[in-house]
């Protein structure tokens, strides 16, 4: 097992905050979105990791953005992430690869391994795939030496730049289905489950807060990561499930989220109220 990295000494050490465990952590994970809505390259990430790297557990390429980038640039990002103990995820691009057949999927996984990716997210927001086939993909990813991270949600057509009206027309699944899927994926060896925000807190008239509540009640928080790339959404998760809930956010939001986790700043409903209790390891 990899030894936990020591948290760097922060400024103003005499001020008490909710201290974070060293990496690798099992709770309070933060995954940041990398290249997609904006250019995120090595030089930008050097600044981000120099200041906030201790709080980032993984970086996710979105929308298959790595397929547009020079291989050298992808490798530089991956290597820089690893230097700062940050894992690298493919994002859910495999569903785009799946429509090209099994050979393309195997080549994709091999290439991800070669480039140094750690996590392959397995999404099916736009396609319909049998659960048993999904389980085979998890097994294939694991046998390649990578971590499988299936994405589960209740919204048909989720995962892209789809309008709220289009998503509403597509309809939603029963949350019981999502819970059953997540349990089967974990039993098959999935590292953690990504919970898609669309249909729950994104592109909806009313937040479906009962869905994450049921998922957490059935599975717990440690094996779930919630998409929350909106300040109101990640503040809601922190308020309701505490500082150690696992969240996916945009790279631009890392400081704002960590201020909430640390209990040093926040909105009126959270200011000074986020508290943790950790046994001393000294």
Predicted regions and their residues:
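C-terminal alpha-helical cap/extension of soluble enzyme domains
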Residues: 5-22, 214-282
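Active-site rim beta-loop-alpha module in soluble metabolic enzymes
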Residues: 186-208
